[in-house]
Structure formats: structure tokens, C-alpha cells
Amino acid sequence: MAQKDSETADQRSVIKVAWTAHKGTGPETGSDVEKFMKQLMPHDPFMMTDQQPDIILFMSGGSEMKAISMIQSGHPVLLVSINGNNAYAAATEVMAWTVNNNIFAMLSDAAEASETGLIDRWCQAVRVWKSLQGRKAGLVGSVSDWLVASDVPAERFLELFNVTLEKIPWNSLQDYSDQEPDASLLNRFNRDTAAGLVEAAKVLTLLRKLAEKNGLNAIAVECFSLVQQREVTACLALAQLNNEGIVAACEGDLASMAGMMLLKVATGSVPWLANTTGTNGNRLLLSHCTVAFDLVSDIKLATHFETDLSLALNGTITASDVTVFRFSGGLDRAFIAEGRVTGHPSLSNACRTQVEIELPQQSLALLRSRPLGNHLLMAPGKYAELLHLVCAYKAIKVI
């Protein structure tokens, strides 16, 4: 994986903790702080440092100036305090200073932050953004021309994610037909003789080689030109890559690729990119053909919906509780909602894998009145609270 600096992946997972107290504090305070933090963060590796801390522990009043000397613009910080000794008062003063200086911070009593899970969520949010730093993504072809709200400038990827976006024209690649078919995909279907499976496995080989050669952690593929010109889809190839943890978005959707990268780090698995096929009452209908195999059961091969050509994936979503997420094209706004799977339709006029999700009325109202785009991301599990914090960390407004 490409890196922008000398930090290793292990170093990026370490939370930086600082402490502050009045000038008369004894030399034993440092070791007391470390013992205290080990109780608060028994499962999170951390290091004590005054340089760009992720968490500052207040041990007493009179510690404000030292605290603000350690806080840097653009680097969010969690302010926690011990009980008593005017520590919370000092933390409150510093919290006000961060607000006045447009620095994102959160304030809590240390014990309460541990009991409520705030420290755990904060550490997760820090690691999400640190983990994305230095990664590399690729756009194969162009953003599909119908995705008028989903283009993301390369500069924005670099600014927000510290991710480099490489644009790769289709005509710069080898012809997919010259590739050996990918054995993992053929074996998944027991070397089924379905028309188009071998061709789909060749597309997978091409994309896998591209990702490996260019050191890509994620790709967005303009796939419709492939099926229109060569009558072969990338659906199964993208599904297999997503299943392996390699983010692969279809239709050249850069906004969705960004969200998939974020959710993959935050949740541990690549979410499903799906069309907003409709809403009815408090139900949302999603459909698409590139779902990771591990997210579905009863997998069948079908033709691609829009063209009735080649192959697409038809499966049954196995999750019950899910989180729905979407970035805006500028990556400055996000939609987040938790829902419950209520049905698995089989409509003939929609993409092959389909699911019905019950969402809060307020969330559905936002999808109708202020959608950020057609494509939505669905991740199994409940992650709304974490994702709200992850977005706040980078001043991304949740609608």
C-alpha cells in the first residue's frame, strides 16, 4: 500500500495521548496518568506524547495554557478530565478555546467517556482517518455521464482522505480477452458453464492485475462502455474484489468509492453499492448487481438488467440490521441512517439483487427532498453513531 509518510500501519493504529496539569505537579504524575489511561483504554494501544495528541487528559486546574500549546489547527482532540481538582473546569475553558478557533473537539469527564463508549468511538474515528492516509485509488475510464452529482475532484480526495486518485483510460489497458480467467471466480461457481462466466473471469484478472501493478486500494470502473461495446459485464469481477476487501465501485462512481473506502475501514467489510430503486411509506428499496458474495445467500447468475447481456449477481441479503450511507459529490456532506431489512423482492424491472429496508421517516424524507445521489451504500450492522463521529471529525455535515 502506498504511504505518504514514514508512519507504518501499526503506528497509525496507536492513539496519541497527552496530559496537562498545573506547574506545581509532582514528577510522579506522568506514571499516574499512564496507569489511569490503561484503565480507560484497556484494548486500545496508545503512546504518551505532547505532539499532535488525539486525547488530552486534564489532571487539574491551571493547566489550560499547556493544553492549548499542544493543540494544532486541523487536528481534532478529545478533552477528558479526572474528577475534581478543577480539572473539568480547565477542560471546559480549553473546549471554549477550540470552538473560538474552529478546531473540532469533544469534552467529557474521563470516567463517563469510558462508560458511554465515547473513548472507544473516538479511537475508532481517529484510526479510520489515519488508516486512509496514503492510500491510492483508481478511476478506470470516466465517471458515467448520468452520475451528475457523483464526480469528486482528485484534489478533494487528497485534501480530505490524503488519498491519491489516478485516472486510467480503458484504452491504456490490455484487452480483457487476452487474460487468463480468474480461477477464484470460476471455482466459486464450480466452473459453471453459464454463458459469459469465463469472460467475466477474464475481466476480473485484468482488474486484479491493474490494482496490483498500480498499488490501488480501491477502483471505480466505468463498466457500461465494456458491456455496450464488448457484451461482457464487470459485475461479477467487482463483486469478487469487494468480497476480498478490495473496494470496487461500478459506473465510475467516485463519491460511492470514497464512501466504500470509509466504511470498509470503519466496519471491516466493503458495503454494497446499490440504486435507490424506490421508496414506499417507511420502506426503501435498493437494487444492484455487484454485491460482495459474503453479504448474500442463494446466489444465482442472471443477465445484466439494463442490457440483458452477460452476467450479473442475484442474491438474498442476509443482514437484518443495516446502516445506509452516502457522501455528496464534494465529500462535504453525508447521509447516515440505520434500518431493518423487511423483504427481499424479485422485481423484473430492477437490478438483480434487491432488498427492502425499513428506515425512520425522517431519513426517508431526506432521501426524497435532499438526496445526495442515486447510489447508496448498505453495510450490515449498526454503525450510525460511529459514522456520525467519523464525519464530525472532518467537519463533514450529516444531513
Give the residues covered by each predicted segment.
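Cofactor- and metal-binding active-site motifs of prokaryotic enzymes
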Residues: A2, T25-Q133, V143-S150, L284-H288
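Structural motif
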Residues: A18, I55-M59, A218-A220
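Conserved, well-structured core segments that form the ligand-binding/active-site neighborhood
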Residues: A96-S269
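Short, glycine-/Ser/Thr-/acidic-enriched flexible segments
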Residues: H22-G24, G62-S63, S142-D145, F224-L226, ...
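Extended hydrophobic packing segments that form well-structured cores
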Residues: L313-I399
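C-terminal catalytic subdomain
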Residues: I246-S346
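General beta-strand structural signal in soluble alpha/beta enzymes
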Residues: M48-D50, L79, M106-D109, E166-I168, ...
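Short beta-strand segments enriched in small/hydrophobic residues
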Residues: K4-G26, G134-S144
